[in-house]
Design a protein with these regions (language model features):
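Mid-domain alpha/beta scaffold segments of enzyme catalytic cores
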Residues: 1-260
């Protein structure tokens, strides 16, 4: 089973061919596509999209890069949506310390942390896994996961150290690998993709972002690229790609049981 565990198919970049892409993905052997929300404003959008396409499944959450526009009422709204719409996970949630601008000040970080921890509490209450955004914030994400334990999930677009990866695995998480792994210069990620146990890895595209090497930066990524991404992982690990499909698919179902 081949599963794209992280794809923003609702993004504006897909307005011209969204439904066609979802259909083509199914026809090309991509069994499931996980579509996380990023803010309250697109909860309904991802739900409607996944209702149109049975191979798509949605997660609901508030992304750390969208907390500036978020209000505390959004947390209550998220709870109401969980009770009424049964998402497969809470996500995309987490912390993002990448923005080296005045915006990344203590008050902004505090708001990120507040939304992250409140959503972890919701995930624990409803026994849902989480889809984590951890950009340049791996240690802090781990810290709050220890304070607010959840049933696991996926650390999306993982780019930490082997030791940090092992800490996520110990907490019940799988690690997402996608387009970044396809670049020959991405030595750390490629090394991780080989050294980690295969049963800790899931595949993703993060489309329309994180375009693989054969597309190049700045060009729209697509869930249709998952087949080649899987082949890259197979080549790095010197495995048959069929085995990569089977094991990473099983890993995704373990991390996100409602996908089954």
């Amino acid at each position: 089973m081949l599963i794209d565990t992280h794809c923003h198919l609702d993004a504006a970049e897909f307005d011209v061919d969204r439904d066609h892409i979802a259909l083509m993905a199914k026809q090309q052997g991509i069994d499931r596509i996980v579509i996380p929300s990023v803010e309250r404003a697109n909860f309904d959008t991802v739900i409607a999209l996944c209702n149109r396409h049975q191979n798509c499944a949605y997660a609901l959450g508030i992304h750390p890069m969208y907390v500036d526009a978020a209000v505390s009422q959004d947390i209550e709204t998220l709870q109401n949506y969980i009770e009424n719409f049964n998402p497969i996970a809470i996500g995309e949630i987490g912390l993002d310390y990448f923005l080296r601008t005045p915006k990344l000040n203590p008050e902004h970080i505090e708001k990120q942390v507040m939304f992250f921890t409140e959503q972890l509490k919701i995930a624990a209450h409803y026994d849902l896994p989480v889809l984590l955004h951890v950009r340049q914030a791996v240690d802090d994400v781990l810290k709050y996961l220890r304070r607010h334990p959840v049933r696991g999930g996926i650390a999306h677009a993982f780019n930490g150290s082997l030791q940090q990866a092992e800490k996520f695995i110990a907490l019940g998480f799988k690690l997402g690998f996608g387009g970044a792994m396809t670049y020959s210069r991405a030595l750390k990620i490629r090394d991780l993709a080989v050294k980690l146990p295969l049963d800790a890895i899931v595949l993703e595209t993060d489309a329309p972002d994180m375009a693989p090497a054969w597309i190049g930066p700045g060009v729209r990524n697509s869930p249709l690229e998952l087949l080649k991404i899987a082949q890259v992982l197979a080549d790095l690990r010197q495995l048959n790609v069929t085995q990569v499909h089977a094991v990473t698919g099983c890993n995704a179902l373990h991390a996100l049981p409602k996908l089954a």
